[in-house]
């Protein structure tokens, strides 16, 4: 991962699936670092790899706040992907882990927008809608918790 991640690119103009890869690699680097001495060579390599994943996640953040994996608005350096609650939550957890392991963090503005987006996607039932466009239909099956006791939600 340390050798190959610097070469990871978007698959095409539509898919921003690489966001998932940067997120999970950041998790892997953070988890592995927890068992290493901070002055070891491997820890420093992991930290550098993690730093590049955080940089990429900053670059891949949606201007709407959060992260998405599909963009229908054409190709741009900063994807115009519609953010999803589950990818945004996953990125924020990974960033938190990187903070604990390496002292790394997302850009403050990006973090604030992502957190604001995520909070806006929460329904009164405590679930999160799938994505921004689903905010208008919180009761649709895709937005409901499978075990929700009230099927009318």
PLM regions and their residue ranges:
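An alpha-helical repeat/solenoid feature that recognizes helix-turn-helix modules
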Residues: 4-55, 59-112, 116, 120-153
């Amino acid at each position: 991962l340390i050798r190959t991640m610097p070469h990871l690119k978007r698959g095409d103009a539509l898919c921003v699936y690489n966001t998932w890869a940067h997120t999970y690699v950041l998790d892997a680097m953070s988890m592995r670092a927890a068992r290493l001495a901070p002055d070891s060579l491997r820890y420093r390599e992991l930290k550098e790899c993690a730093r590049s994943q955080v940089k990429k996640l900053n670059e891949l953040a949606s201007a709407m706040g959060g992260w998405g994996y599909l963009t229908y608005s054409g190709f741009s350096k900063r994807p115009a992907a519609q953010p999803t609650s589950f990818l945004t939550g996953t990125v924020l957890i990974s960033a938190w882990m990187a903070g604990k392991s390496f002292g790394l963090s997302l850009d403050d503005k990006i973090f604030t927008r992502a957190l604001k987006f995520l909070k806006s996607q929460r329904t009164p039932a405590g679930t999160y809608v799938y994505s921004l466009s689903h905010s208008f239909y919180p009761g649709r099956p895709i937005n409901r918790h499978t075990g929700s006791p009230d099927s009318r939600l």
